[in-house]
Amino acid sequence: MDFNEIKNTADKYLMPTYGHFPIALTGGKNASLTASDGRVVIDFTSGIGVNIFGVNDDGWKKAFIEQIDKIQHTSNLYYNEPVAKAAKLLCEKSGVDKVLFCNSGAEANECAIKLARKYSFDRYGENRNTIISLVNSFHGRTMATITATGQEHYHKYFMPFMGGFKYAEAGDKKAFSELLDGTVCAVILEVIQGEGGVVITPRDY
């Protein structure tokens, strides 16, 4: 398929949840990606953080093929060695006690929101459940994470939203401090905001 065929087919059958750049990727190696028209471009997004080893990485492919030759999926109903070993390694390297593997950033943030509120409820009672987020943040497309996202244009069409979220301007310590009352159980923030540019919060924030 050439680019127009790919684009027209995708536009016809895929839900328009994302804006696409006018390019179709067909292959690549490391940070170099090949387009359907033969162009070679550099991937500065790392596949939005997914392809951190680059595209078509030899070590990743070898590990993937070795595992797929054994069993491709077991669900969470059963134990399996690769998951146990990965969890152990992550805990040892990060200093945390437990890890949870998720399918997306939105799912991870949903779990973090639930975990923060559950911990706060158990420790402080039911009236300490507010989560502070930053204006212009982006935390996901589920109902909880789109509420945590501090951008009005994401809030237009999906009312009513989940309660218990407040927003502060990134870098404004005074505005942030004023939100820290006795109802706050957690803060969710991006140290570097990626929506609308690369916005770095000050070190002393």
Question: Model regions: which residues?
Answer:
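Glycine-rich loop-to-alpha-helix module at the N-terminal edge of alpha/beta enzyme cores
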Residues: 12, 40-126
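Active-site-adjacent loop/helix segments that line or gate small-molecule/cofactor pockets in enzymes
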Residues: 1-29, 77
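Active-site core of PLP-dependent enzymes with the aminotransferase class I/II
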Residues: 192-205
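Active-site and channel-lining beta-strand-loop segments
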Residues: 23-43
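PLP-dependent aspartate aminotransferase-fold enzymes
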Residues: 87-189
